[in-house]
C-alpha cells in the first residue's frame, strides 16, 4: 500500500511540473503569419497548395465600353472601312479622316451600286494599317468615252450618283475606243489605286453601255499584271440592280508606273491613296465609345492591362495581355498558409512554425513569440520579412513584361474560295493559343513554386540565425521553439530579435540551470514508464488483496468452494 501511495505521489509530481514556468528559464518560438482562409494556387509539385495571399493573373471581363484614350478611335457608325474608302455617299463624312483604330459596327451597310471585292480582307487590312483615307486626285485622260457614270442605286441627296473615288466609264455616242493610260509614281511613297470592272446583268445592257459584246480590263505595273473579263449575267437584285461591280486594287511603288488598258467595262480610278506604315487597325465591335483611358481594346470593350493574361477576346488592339484559354491563374504573393491551431503545445503553450502558423501578426511575415518571467509576448522580424517581400515584389511586373503584346492582333477574314487557307489559319491560331495557355500555366506554377520555396527558406534562415546566437544557452525543443536556460526578460528577448544577444554573458547561468533542471526533470518517456509501472503494481496489489480476502473467507467458513470432477 505504501508503494502505491508513493507511485501516485510521484506521478502527480511529474505532471505538476512545467519546465517553462520557472523564473530562471524562458521559451522562445519562431513562426510565420497565417490567415484563417488562404488561397489555393498551383505549383510544379502540387495541383493545389494554400498560400496566405495570391493575385489573379487573368483578366476575364471588359469595362463594357471602348476608351477613346490612349488611341484615336474612329467610330464608323453606319459605314464599313471599305465603303468609306470607296466614297459611298452616306460615308462622305469620313473622307480624309485619320485613326489608330477604326470601329466597324454590325449596323453598317452599303448604300451604293452593289459590289464585291475578291480580296476584301487584304484590302481592308492595308487601308486599316495605313490609318488614313487621305486621297489625291490625278489627271487621268480618258479620251472617247463618257465619264462620271451614275446609278439610281447610289443616291447622293436626291440625285443619282456613284462612288466618289471611282470613275465609271461608258460609251460616247456609238463608240468605246480602246483606252491606254499610264501614270508614273514619281513620289517617294507607295500609292494605292482602286479600280473595278462592271458585270452587266445581260448582253443587251453590255452593248448598250459599252458597244462591244465583251469588254476587258488589264492593269499592269513593272511587278504585276491583272486582266479581268466581265461575267455577264443576271444576279439577285440589290437596290434595284442585278449587275455587279468587282473592285480590285494595285500598289505602285516609287519609280514604278501604272498602266491601264481597256476596251470596255472599266471603272477607273480618280487618283490614289497614300499608303503609310503604322500600327493602325480596324475592329468590329458594338461596344459604345466613351471618354476613358485604356491601352488595350477588344471587341467586348477596353480592358485593363495590369494583368499578363486575358480571356476576354482573341482580337485585341494596343498593349494587351496575352489571350489564353484559362479563366483563372493565381500567382502566389504570400507564403505557404498553415492555419493556427486553437490548442498548441504540450502544455497549451506557444508553438513554433513547424506545428502551425500564427494568425494576427500585423508587424511582419516572420516573428517571435516568447514566455518569460514577465509574461508572454509577440514581435515581428522586419529584416526577414523585407527580404521575402523584396524577392516577391516585381514578380507580377516581370510576368507582364514577358507576355504583354506591344502590337495588335487583327481579325482574319477569307473568302469562300480560300476555305482551306482559312482552316489552316484557324489551326495555326488555335495552336498558338494552346501553346500560350500551356506556357502561362507552366510559368505561373514555376513562379509559385519559387515563391513558396523562398518564403520557407527565409523562415529557416531566421531559425538558424537564432540557434547560432543562443548556442549552448538554449535547447531546441522541436517544432520551432527554444528553451532558454537562463533568466531572459523582455530586453534579453529583444537582443535576440535584433541580433545583439551575447551568449557569453548568460553562459554560466545557463549551464548551472541546465544541470539543476536536468537533475530533476523527467522526460515524457519516463513519465510513460512510471505510469505503466504504477498501473501494473496497483493491479497486482488489488489481485493480492482480493485473493487474500477469498482465502480468509474460506477459512472462516463464510465462503465455500466446491470443485467437481
From Swiss-Prot:
Write the gene name: HA
The set of disulfide-linked cysteines is 29-481, 67-292, 79-91, 112-154, 296-320, 488-492
Membrane topology, record value: Single-pass type I membrane protein
The site annotation (Cleavage) covers 344-345
Protein name per Swiss-Prot or TrEMBL: Hemagglutinin
Q: Which residues lie on this side of the membrane: Extracellular?
A: 17-529
UniProt entry keywords in alphabetical sequence = Clathrin- and caveolin-independent endocytosis of virus by host, Clathrin-mediated endocytosis of virus by host, Disulfide bond, Fusion of virus membrane with host endosomal membrane, Fusion of virus membrane with host membrane, Glycoprotein, Hemagglutinin, Host cell membrane, Host membrane, Host-virus interaction, Lipoprotein, Membrane, Palmitate, Signal, Transmembrane, Transmembrane helix, Viral attachment to host cell, Viral envelope protein, Viral penetration into host cytoplasm, Virion, Virus endocytosis by host, Virus entry into host cell
| Subunit and interaction comment | Homotrimer of disulfide-linked HA1-HA2.
Intervals, Cytoplasmic compartment: 551-565
Q: What Pfam family does this protein match (any one)?
A: Hemagglutinin
Q: Report the GO terms under cellular component.
A: host cell plasma membrane; membrane; viral envelope; virion membrane
PTM: Palmitoylated.
Q: What else is known?
A: Major glycoprotein, comprises over 80% of the envelope proteins present in virus particle. The extent of infection into host organism is determined by HA. Influenza viruses bud from the apical surface of polarized epithelial cells (e.g. bronchial epithelial cells) into lumen of lungs and are therefore usually pneumotropic. The reason is that HA is cleaved by tryptase clara which is restricted to lungs. However, HAs of H5 and H7 pantropic avian viruses subtypes can be cleaved by furin and subtilisin-type enzymes, allowing the virus to grow in other organs than lungs.
Statement: the UniProt record of this protein carries the keyword Transmembrane: yes
Q: Which residues form the signal peptide?
A: 1-16
Q: Where in the cell is the protein located?
A: Virion membrane; Host apical cell membrane
Q: Which residues are glycosylated?
A: 23, 37, 53, 68, 78, 180, 300, 498
Which SUPFAM superfamilies does the UniProt record give?
A: Influenza hemagglutinin (stalk) (SSF58064), Viral protein domain (SSF49818)
UniProt-listed Gene3D superfamilies: 3.90.20.10, 3.90.209.20
Which chain regions cross the lipid bilayer?
530-550
Return the similarity comment: Belongs to the influenza viruses hemagglutinin family.
Amino acid at each position: 500500500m505504501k508503494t502505491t501511495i508513493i507511485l501516485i505521489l510521484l506521478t502527480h509530481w511529474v505532471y505538476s511540473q512545467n519546465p517553462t514556468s520557472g523564473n530562471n528559464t524562458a521559451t522562445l518560438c519562431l513562426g510565420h503569419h497565417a490567415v484563417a482562409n488562404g488561397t489555393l494556387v498551383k505549383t510544379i509539385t502540387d495541383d493545389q497548395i494554400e498560400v496566405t495571399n495570391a493575385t489573379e493573373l487573368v483578366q476575364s471581363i471588359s469595362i463594357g465600353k471602348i476608351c477613346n484614350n490612349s488611341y484615336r478611335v474612329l467610330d464608323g457608325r453606319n459605314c464599313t472601312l471599305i465603303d468609306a474608302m470607296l466614297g459611298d455617299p452616306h460615308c462622305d463624312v469620313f473622307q480624309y479622316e485619320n485613326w489608330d483604330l477604326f470601329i466597324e459596327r454590325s449596323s453598317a451597310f452599303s448604300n451604293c451600286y452593289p459590289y464585291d471585292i475578291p480580296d476584301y480582307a487584304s484590302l481592308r487590312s492595308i487601308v486599316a494599317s495605313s490609318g488614313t483615307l487621305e486621297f489625291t486626285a490625278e489627271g487621268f485622260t480618258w479620251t472617247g468615252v463618257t465619264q462620271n457614270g451614275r446609278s439610281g442605286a447610289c443616291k447622293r441627296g436626291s440625285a443619282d450618283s456613284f462612288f466618289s473615288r471611282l470613275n465609271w466609264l461608258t460609251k460616247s455616242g456609238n463608240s468605246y475606243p480602246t483606252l491606254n493610260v499610264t501614270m508614273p509614281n514619281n513620289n517617294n511613297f507607295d500609292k494605292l489605286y482602286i479600280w473595278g470592272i462592271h458585270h452587266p446583268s445581260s448582253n443587251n445592257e453590255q452593248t448598250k453601255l459599252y458597244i462591244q459584246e465583251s469588254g476587258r480590263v488589264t492593269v499592269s505595273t513593272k511587278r504585276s499584271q491583272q486582266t479581268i473579263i466581265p461575267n455577264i449575267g443576271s444576279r439577285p437584285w440589290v437596290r434595284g440592280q442585278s449587275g455587279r461591280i468587282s473592285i480590285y486594287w494595285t500598289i505602285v511603288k516609287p519609280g514604278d508606273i501604272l498602266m491601264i488598258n481597256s476596251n470596255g467595262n472599266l471603272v477607273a480610278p480618280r487618283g490614289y491613296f497614300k499608303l503609310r506604315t503604322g500600327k493602325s487597325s480596324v475592329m468590329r465591335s458594338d461596344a459604345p465609345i466613351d471618354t476613358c483611358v485604356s491601352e488595350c481594346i477588344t471587341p467586348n470593350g477596353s480592358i485593363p492591362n495590369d494583368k499578363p493574361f486575358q480571356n476576354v477576346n482573341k482580337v485585341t488592339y494596343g498593349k494587351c495581355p496575352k489571350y489564353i484559354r484559362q479563366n483563372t491563374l493565381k500567382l502566389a504573393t504570400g507564403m505557404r498558409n498553415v492555419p493556427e491551431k486553437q490548442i498548441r503545445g504540450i502544455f497549451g503553450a506557444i508553438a513554433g512554425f513547424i506545428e502551425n502558423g500564427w494568425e494576427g501578426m500585423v508587424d511582419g511575415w516572420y516573428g517571435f513569440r516568447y514566455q518569460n518571467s514577465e509574461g508572454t509576448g509577440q514581435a515581428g522580424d522586419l529584416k526577414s520579412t523585407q527580404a521575402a517581400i523584396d524577392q516577391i515584389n516585381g514578380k507580377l511586373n516581370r510576368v507582364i513584361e514577358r507576355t504583354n503584346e506591344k502590337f495588335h492582333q487583327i481579325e482574319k477574314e477569307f473568302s469562300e474560295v480560300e476555305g482551306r487557307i482559312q482552316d489552316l489559319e484557324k489551326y495555326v491560331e488555335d495552336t498558338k493559343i494552346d501553346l500560350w495557355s500551356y506556357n502561362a500555366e507552366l510559368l505561373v506554377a514555376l513562379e509559385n513554386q519559387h515563391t513558396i520555396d523562398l518564403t520557407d527558406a527565409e523562415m529557416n534562415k531566421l531559425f538558424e540565425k537564432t540557434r547560432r546566437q543562443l548556442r549552448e544557452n538554449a535547447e531546441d525543443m522541436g517544432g520551432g521553439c527554444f528553451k532558454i536556460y537562463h533568466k531572459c526578460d523582455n530586453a534579453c528577448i529583444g537582443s535576440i530579435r535584433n541580433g545583439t544577444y551575447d551568449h557569453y554573458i548568460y553562459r554560466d547561468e545557463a549551464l548551472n540551470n541546465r544541470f539543476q533542471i536536468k537533475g530533476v526533470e523527467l522526460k515524457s518517456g519516463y513519465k510513460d514508464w512510471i505510469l505503466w509501472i504504477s498501473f501494473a503494481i496497483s493491479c497486482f496489489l488489488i489481485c493480492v488483496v482480493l485473493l487474500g480476502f477469498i482465502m480468509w473467507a474460506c477459512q472462516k467458513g463464510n465462503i465455500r468452494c466446491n470443485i467437481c470432477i
